[in-house]
């Protein structure tokens, strides 16, 4: 560590204020704490470096000496006045961490109750199931307490013993000597894996784990109005806790299939309905499909293509139970691509009656028409 820049370790520039040092330490210590990075040796070493840097930079006298001489001078022996024990007796950095976070992580080192891990499961729903709600039965695989050993991990009739390496704490303390003095750090005990206990005769069913993998069927009530991206928490349905800790939670991720006719936007439903040119001009009554069934709706005369009408309360029920969204019907007026002579004559008459001027070629006999007549 002596070859490293303590400021750089905390992501700071030299001369950083006390508040900046504290904020940087808090952020990095939470990120690299062993409890959040179990089995990650790189994160464990990073955590040690972070605490070592903070022990120096948080102490005014040590910080002043460090700022004056720099880490390179320590390596060259220019700081020999401190010797190897200038800062001995500093204690473990877990005390520093606990002073910041109230001992929230220390309970694990003392083998206190530990909450079980959370689980996730994705449920696929049809459009209608999401709108009206549905009961689903899912099957998940999770750890369950071993029935053979009642979760102890030890063979029936035997018991676990306190780890003789860590004394039951689950952590071992390691002293590191640097030019700034002796630093005491802790790491997970490699003999008991942090449990503080060792099992001489493990259970033959769970092989000492205390848990076994089992498939479990769970019925879940999915409320009306859910949509893709919604997450439903099922409390206590996750992995079992340790040392009497609570179970984790199961989070149900919702995924809704699209519909061939309906488009959902929030709690509103959108649909397109096609009508003919004549019906748009004269008005008509159409049958509109909704999630509740078909309804009749009158289209007024002179409706323009793209006009949108609202069917109040025909949308998706709100998850909180306060009413429903609306359904919006967008009318598309279909213009015929080809018409016969009778239809053409009627349209020309309509335009003339409306006072519209015909185009230069509209309604006139074409050359092709004249040629056809000459052969009749």
UniProtKB/Swiss-Prot annotation:
Free-text note on domains in this protein's UniProt record: The J domain is necessary and sufficient to stimulate DnaK ATPase activity. Zinc center 1 plays an important role in the autonomous, DnaK-independent chaperone activity of DnaJ. Zinc center 2 is essential for interaction with DnaK and for DnaJ activity.
Record localization: Cytoplasm
Protein name in the entry: Chaperone protein DnaJ
Pfam families: DnaJ, DnaJ_C, DnaJ_CXXCXGXG
CXXCXGXG motif repeats: 146-153, 163-170, 189-196, 203-210
Principal location class: cytoplasm
GO cellular component, one term: cytoplasm
CDD domains associated with the record: DnaJ, DnaJ_C, DnaJ_zf
Family note: Belongs to the DnaJ family.
Co-factor note (free text): Binds 2 Zn(2+) ions per monomer.
UniProt xrefs under Gene3D superfamilies: DnaJ domain, Heat shock protein DnaJ, cysteine-rich domain, Urease metallochaperone UreE, N-terminal domain
Taxonomic classification: Bacteria, Bacillati, Bacillota, Clostridia, Eubacteriales
Residue ranges of domain J in the record: 5-70
Role noted for this protein: Participates actively in the response to hyperosmotic and heat shock by preventing the aggregation of stress-denatured proteins and by disaggregating proteins, also in an autonomous, DnaK-independent fashion. Unfolded proteins bind initially to DnaJ; upon interaction with the DnaJ-bound protein, DnaK hydrolyzes its bound ATP, resulting in the formation of a stable complex. GrpE releases ADP from DnaK; ATP binding to DnaK triggers the release of the substrate protein, thus completing the reaction cycle.
Annotated Zn(2+) 2 binding sites: 163, 166, 189, 192
Record keywords: Chaperone, Cytoplasm, DNA replication, Metal-binding, Repeat, Stress response, Zinc, Zinc-finger
Known partners and oligomeric status: Homodimer.
Zn finger (CR-type) start-end: 133-215
GO biological process: chaperone cofactor-dependent protein refolding; DNA replication; protein refolding; response to heat
GO molecular function, one term: unfolded protein binding
Binding site for Zn(2+) 1: 146, 149, 203, 206
SMART domains named among the record's database cross-references: DnaJ
Cofactor(s) listed in the protein's UniProt record: Zn(2+)
Key word Hydrolase present: no
NCBIfam families in UniProt: DnaJ_bact, PRK10767.1, PRK14297.1
């Amino acid at each position: 560590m002596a070859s490293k820049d303590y400021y750089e370790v905390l992501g700071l520039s030299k001369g950083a204020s006390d508040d900046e040092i504290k904020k940087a330490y808090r952020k990095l210590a939470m990120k690299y704490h062993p409890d959040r990075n179990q089995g990650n040796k790189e994160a464990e070493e990073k955590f040690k470096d972070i605490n070592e840097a903070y022990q120096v930079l948080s102490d005014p006298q040590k910080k002043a000496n460090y700022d004056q001489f720099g880490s390179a001078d320590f390596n060259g022996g220019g700081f020999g006045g401190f010797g190897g024990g200038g800062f001995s007796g500093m204690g473990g950095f877990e005390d520093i961490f606990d002073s910041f976070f109230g001992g929230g992580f220390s309970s694990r080192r003392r083998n206190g109750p530990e909450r079980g891990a959370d689980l996730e499961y994705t449920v696929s729903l049809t459009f209608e199931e999401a709108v009206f709600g549905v009961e689903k039965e899912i099957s998940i695989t999770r750890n369950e307490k071993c029935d053979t050993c009642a979760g102890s991990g030890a063979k029936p009739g035997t018991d676990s013993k306190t780890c003789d390496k860590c004394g039951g704490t689950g952590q071992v303390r390691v002293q590191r000597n640097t030019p700034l003095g002796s630093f005491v750090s802790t790491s997970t005990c490699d003999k008991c894996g942090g449990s503080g206990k060792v099992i001489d005769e493990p259970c033959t069913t769970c092989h000492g784990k205390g848990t076994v993998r089992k498939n479990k069927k769970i019925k879940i009530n999915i409320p009306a109005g859910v949509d893709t991206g919604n997450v439903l928490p099922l409390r206590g349905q996750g992995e079992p806790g340790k040392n009497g800790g609570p179970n984790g939670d199961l989070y149900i991720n919702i995924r809704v299939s699209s519909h061939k006719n309906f488009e959902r936007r929030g709690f509103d439903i959108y649909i397109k309905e096609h009508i003919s040119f004549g019906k748009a001009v004269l008005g008509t009554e159409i049958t509109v499909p909704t999630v509740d069934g078909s309804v009749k709706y009158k289209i007024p005369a002179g409706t323009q293509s793209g006009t949108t009408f609202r069917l109040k309360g025909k949308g998706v029920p709100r998850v909180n139970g306060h009413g429903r969204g609306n359904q919006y019907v967008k009318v598309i007026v279909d213009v015929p691509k080809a018409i016969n002579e009778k239809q053409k004559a009627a349209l020309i008459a309509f335009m003339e009656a409306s006072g519209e001027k015909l185009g230069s070629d509209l309604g006139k006999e074409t050359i092709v028409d004249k040629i056809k007549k000459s052969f009749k």
